[in-house]
């Protein structure tokens, strides 16, 4: 990446660095822009003065021009400072930070130019960050996050009605973390990636603005990240249009620039992911499934970084990734548009060569102007509504482009190449025993494997390795997982990753599932990779009662609609901004990629088993992307996990988003592709409920809303049965099988009489009949109501599965 571009991005990312320093009350004088400049001089440039000795000086003779460009981005991102600087001839002609800031600020706030400026109505420096879900959907709430940093050892930060002040001590701890990376500031792609990681870890719950008269729900990290993305796009756009005097183009003529289509909202989507993951049939399916899922996640991340690198951007320009899908903000230049086209063509050539038509990538792009993103001063309600509709329409247009490409996937050259192959589009004569391809098979043993499945088998044990949390993307490696554009993925230790950075063939490195705050370690990735046992058969042995696997498929209901219209319902759409949709996407990804591991490792709910809540779940995450989850494990743990994940998600989103799921039970030798299909059918049944927000358990017949399953089926009816038969399970089993037989014939008129007769016969004449009478009365009450009868039938099945000792088919 161009060094001056890197400087521009760093300047944009750090333009508000003075805010946490100011709120920490460390003794620096002046407004946050002056404090930020002084702080950077002390930490980065090793200025020996005490904080109180700094003044608002900008003409430092001992600081080089290159360093001053970064410092000036911090000093001159507000209009009043810009105007004074321009009048005094101090403003750099090639600094885009000020216009990028204005656009970013215009997307998420803002009545005041600065939260320590004269326009601020109520400056509340101790305010916490409020949840974006307060303004999502209908119904306004006032929940706030706890003032803390991201920590992979802690549960996700759930917003609460209790306000916890963000005091100066908490800010001081954040500033100390920031110092660790700012002290070694360098102009490199790797440093940019690490800086973004540290800013996310430290500033995700720090409010960008503390003006209490505005909605304080955009984090400082999301504001800085968006400013960095906009600044990079502007730099490229003005370079491409031959405008070297940025001051003239962006400051003197800023209203003209706001209407220029300088940006390109771009998306891509990888099709065929589910079939690729589940189309296997071999021993060791658990390891292979996880390896294939992880491989596709890394394929998506590699595609993202490759496209960004070709355009000349950092991950600040990534708005969302998950489930093989991504949104990026690019400059609207001929070079960027051609890069997207070439990227799509080369990626599909590689996918065709390696996977035939199983995987396909489609891209889409729409140009937009700053005014498509910004709230303008004195914007009327109708203007806000029209702007919000234009913004959501961009995503609809992108979706239409993707759909059109999926209907006409390949170019003429690609079709000719496909037609030159065998009838199934593949080459070769031996079939891989795992994925059934015939175009890469190289082994000749009893279970022949293609080269990819051999590599995945070798990688499967490394995916969960604590000592190999680092991933390298390299050129020309002979071992590892193949990726498009001549790259290879390998796993390594921290020490090996450090050495690899010095090698020219290393493109980039990733750190998996760890907040390495303050360390320059490359791109941080969150992956749902929890695993308790390496083989499915081990889960069957650990299940209580019947020896069965539980399989869960779950996803967010109406996520596409939520993404494009979720912030449209309040304030005439004025909250439907790119800063909020980007933060919304990031927090969902964090929930399903990071927090899901925590929920499995440290459960709280045991409504069926009643086991020790602290016992980690017996389960494996096969896949957990942007909003889609596939988990296999002991059947009882899987059901309880599904309930708990939904509970945590409900708390996190304030009930504004819902999930639906299918949960099936299978023998451990059942083909995984069939499991996936059958549980997918159950998930569809859950989504067919009015309002969705449900779960289908074992069979489409047993489809319930989540609250109904937990409160009515499990806590009421299952618990009633289990408590009564506690200590006398053998007598209970025969009784329950007869109840199920009668419930199955409930619509027959004679069955009601048979039901009463059977309950009467079951009374123990020699014992205390009062408990039985109470038990039977509840059963009879439930039998008469069709909804209660369905819930009772499900509860009886759960009790049988929980107490059955011998497996029978």
Curated annotation (Swiss-Prot):
GO biological process: one example: defense response to virus
Cofactor: a divalent metal cation
GO function term, MF aspect, one: transferase activity
EC numbers for this chain: 3.1.-.-, 2.7.7.-
Disruption phenotype: Deletion of the entire CRISPR-Cas locus (cas6 to cas2, Rv2824c to Rv2816c) decreases resistance to plasmids encoding spacer elements about 6-fold.
Superkingdom of the source species: Bacteria
PANTHER family: CRISPR SYSTEM SINGLE-STRAND-SPECIFIC DEOXYRIBONUCLEASE CAS10/CSM1 (SUBTYPE III-A), CRISPR SYSTEM SINGLE-STRAND-SPECIFIC DEOXYRIBONUCLEASE CAS10_CSM1 (SUBTYPE III-A)
Name of the protein: CRISPR system single-strand-specific deoxyribonuclease Cas10/Csm1 (subtype III-A)
């Amino acid at each position: 990446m161009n060094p001056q571009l890197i400087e521009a991005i760093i300047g944009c990312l750090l333009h508000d660095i003075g805010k946490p320093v100011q709120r920490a009350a460390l003794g620096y004088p002046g407004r946050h822009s002056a404090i930020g400049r002084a702080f950077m001089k002390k930490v980065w440039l090793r200025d020996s003065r005490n904080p109180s000795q700094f003044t608002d000086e900008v003409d430092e003779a001992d600081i080089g021009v290159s360093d001053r460009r970064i410092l000036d981005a911090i000093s001159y991102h507000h209009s009043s400072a810009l105007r004074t600087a321009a009048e005094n001839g101090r403003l750099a002609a090639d600094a885009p930070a000020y216009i990028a800031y204005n656009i970013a600020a215009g997307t998420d706030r803002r009545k005041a130019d600065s939260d320590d400026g004269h326009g601020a109505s109520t400056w509340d420096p101790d305010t916490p960050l409020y949840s974006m879900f307060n303004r999502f959907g209908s119904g306004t709430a006032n929940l706030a996050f706890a003032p803390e940093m991201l920590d992979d050892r802690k549960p996700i930060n759930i917003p609460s009605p209790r306000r916890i002040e963000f005091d100066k001590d908490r800010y001081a701890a954040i500033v100390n973390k920031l110092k660790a990376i700012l002290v070694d500031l360098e102009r490199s792609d790797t440093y940019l990636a690490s800086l973004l990681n540290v800013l996310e870890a430290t500033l995700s719950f720090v409010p960008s603005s503390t003006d209490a008269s505005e909605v304080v729900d955009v984090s400082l990290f999301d504001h800085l990240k968006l400013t960095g993305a906009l600044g990079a796009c502007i730099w490229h756009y003005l370079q491409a249009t031959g405008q070297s005097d940025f001051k003239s183009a962006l400051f003197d003529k800023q209203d003209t620039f706001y209407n220029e289509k300088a940006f390109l909202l771009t998306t891509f989507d990888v099709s065929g992911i589910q079939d690729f993951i589940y189309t296997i049939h071999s021993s060791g399916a658990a390891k292979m499934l996880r390896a294939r899922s992880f491989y596709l996640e890394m394929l998506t991340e590699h595609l993202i970084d490759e496209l960004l690198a070709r355009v000349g951007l950092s991950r600040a320009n990534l708005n969302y990734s998950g489930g093989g899908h991504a949104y990026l903000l690019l400059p609207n230049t001929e070079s960027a548009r051609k890069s997207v086209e070439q990227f799509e063509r080369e990626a599909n050539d590689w996918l065709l060569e390696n996977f035939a038509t199983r995987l396909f990538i489609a891209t889409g792009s729409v140009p937009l102007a700053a005014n498509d993103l910004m709230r303008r001063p004195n914007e009327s309600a109708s203007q806000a509504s029209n702007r919000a509709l234009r913004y959501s329409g961009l995503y609809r247009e992108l979706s239409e482009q993707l759909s059109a490409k999926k209907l006409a996937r390949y170019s003429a050259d690609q079709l000719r190449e496909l037609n030159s192959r065998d009838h199934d589009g593949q080459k070769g004569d031996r079939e891989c025993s795992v994925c059934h391809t015939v175009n890469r098979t190289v082994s000749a043993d009893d279970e022949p494997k293609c080269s990819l499945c051999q590599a995945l088998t070798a990688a499967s044990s490394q995916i969960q390795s604590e000592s190999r949390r680092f991933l390298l993307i390299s050129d020309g490696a002979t071992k590892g997982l193949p990726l498009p554009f001549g790259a290879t993925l390998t796993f390594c230790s921290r020490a090996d990753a450090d050495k690899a950075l010095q090698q020219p063939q290393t493109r980039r490195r990733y750190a998996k599932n760890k907040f390495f705050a303050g360390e320059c370690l490359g791109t941080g990735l969150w992956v749902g990779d929890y695993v308790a046992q390496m083989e499915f058969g081990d889960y069957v042995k650990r299940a209580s009662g019947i020896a069965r696997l539980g399989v869960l498929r779950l996803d967010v209901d109406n996520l596409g609609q939520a993404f494009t219209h979720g912030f449209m319902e309040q304030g005439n759409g004025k909250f439907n901004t790119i800063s909020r949709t980007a933060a919304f996407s990031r927090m969902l990804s964090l929930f399903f990629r990071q927090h899901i591991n925590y929920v499995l490792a440290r459960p709280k709910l045991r409504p069926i088993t009643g086991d020790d809540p602290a016992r980690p779940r017996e389960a494996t995450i096969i896949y957990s992307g942007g909003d889609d989850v596939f988990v296999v494990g002991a059947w009882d743990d899987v059901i309880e996990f599904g309930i708990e994940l939904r509970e945590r998600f409900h708390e996190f989103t304030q009930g504004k988003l819902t999930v639906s799921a299918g949960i099936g039970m299978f023998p451990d030798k059942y083909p995984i592709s069939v499991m996936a299909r059958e549980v997918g059918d159950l998930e569809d049944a859950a989504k067919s409920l009015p309002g969705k927000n449900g779960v289908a358990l074992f069979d489409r017949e047993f489809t319930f809303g989540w609250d109904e399953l937990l409160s009515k089926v499990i806590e009421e009816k299952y618990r009633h049965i289990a408590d009564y038969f506690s200590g006398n399970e053998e007598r209970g089993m025969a009784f329950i099988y007869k109840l199920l037989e009668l419930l199955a014939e409930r619509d027959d008129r004679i069955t009601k009489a048979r039901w009463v007769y059977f309950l009467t016969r079951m009374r123990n004449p020699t014992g205390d009949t009062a408990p039985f009478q109470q038990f039977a009365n509840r059963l009879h009450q439930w039998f008469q109501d069709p909804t209660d009868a369905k819930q009772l039938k499900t509860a009886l099945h759960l009790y049988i599965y929980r107490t059955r000792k011998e497996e029978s088919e």
